[in-house]
């Protein structure tokens, strides 16, 4: 009972920013639920081999498992400075379309680079991950116009194993995060993502996660206004499947946090 209470308190604490985010501006009328499907292959770093990396494919839909309009393919190379500090350089290609007119081609495509720092904390069962990211983004629109933007991101991710003390083979766990997106050119507070879900690590290779993600995008209603007055928000069901490659030199039962790379 104490374990379940602690896990519930953890999820409640991390999901608490969601109402606050909604309160900053009136949200648009209720929209249908969307869905995200994320497929990831990862080679984790470690004590013996500090270099790692991953590749990922992702699709997003306007409705549950249909009306897909957004696709991305990305990857990165990571280096473990020590067991609790990891740096990564990544890049990807992103495509956004009108789900009602897919034959017309993408509304815009994006090429993105980013630099990332991840700090990990372990407090008995509870694991906390702080992720800091700087992004450079090059857009090409349907009319052949282009744009360049930058963005800063911070994500606090918490993990709590339910049936073991560590997240290893055969572990059922909870995961929750809140991520802020900041735009140096404004609006400064561009986006907020709040996620809560459950996952299961089948063995040293496969992990599956299913969760709820609330995403709110904030825009100024007029140039120079300080108060955010226009909000677009959406609920999403997220399915994430991860395959981790294992090295022969990896320690048996090594704990690797099941972080989503998005």
Predicted regions: what is each one?
Residues 24-86:
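Start-of-domain marker
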Residues 43, 57-63, 91-97, 121-123, ...:
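Transmembrane beta-strands of outer-membrane beta-barrel pores
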Residues 53-57, 89, 117, 130-132, ...:
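Membrane-embedded beta-strand positions of outer-membrane beta-barrel proteins
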Residues 117, 233-262:
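Outer-membrane beta-barrel "beta-signal"
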Residues 131-219, 223, 262:
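Outer-membrane beta-barrel transmembrane domain signature
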């Amino acid at each position: 009972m104490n374990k379940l209470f602690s896990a519930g308190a953890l999820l409640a604490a991390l999901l608490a920013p969601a109402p606050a985010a909604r309160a900053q501006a009136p949200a648009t009328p209720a929209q249908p639920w969307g869905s995200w499907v994320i497929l990831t292959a990862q080679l984790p770093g470690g004590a013996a081999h500090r270099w790692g990396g991953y590749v990922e494919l992702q699709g997003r839909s306007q409705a549950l498992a249909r009306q897909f309009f957004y696709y991305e393919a990305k990857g990165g190379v990571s280096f473990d400075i020590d067991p609790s500090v990891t740096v990564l350089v990544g890049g990807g290609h992103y495509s956004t379309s009108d789900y009602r007119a897919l034959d017309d081609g993408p509304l815009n495509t994006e090429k993105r680079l980013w630099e990332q720092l991840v700090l990990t904390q372990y407090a008995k069962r509870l694991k906390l991950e702080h992720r800091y990211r700087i992004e450079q983004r090059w857009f090409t629109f349907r009319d052949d116009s282009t744009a360049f933007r930058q963005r800063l991101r911070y994500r606090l991710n918490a993990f709590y194993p339910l049936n073991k003390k560590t997240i290893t083979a055969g572990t059922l766990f909870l995961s929750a995060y809140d991520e802020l997106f900041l735009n140096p050119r404004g609006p400064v507070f561009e986006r907020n993502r709040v996620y809560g879900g459950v996952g299961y690590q089948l063995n040293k290779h496969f992990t599956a996660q299913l969760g709820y993600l609330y995403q709110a995008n904030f825009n100024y209603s007029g140039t120079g206004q300080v108060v955010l007055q226009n909000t677009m928000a959406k609920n999403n069901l997220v399915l994430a499947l991860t395959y981790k490659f294992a090295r022969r030199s990896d320690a048996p039962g090594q704990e690797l946090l099941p972080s989503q790379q998005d």
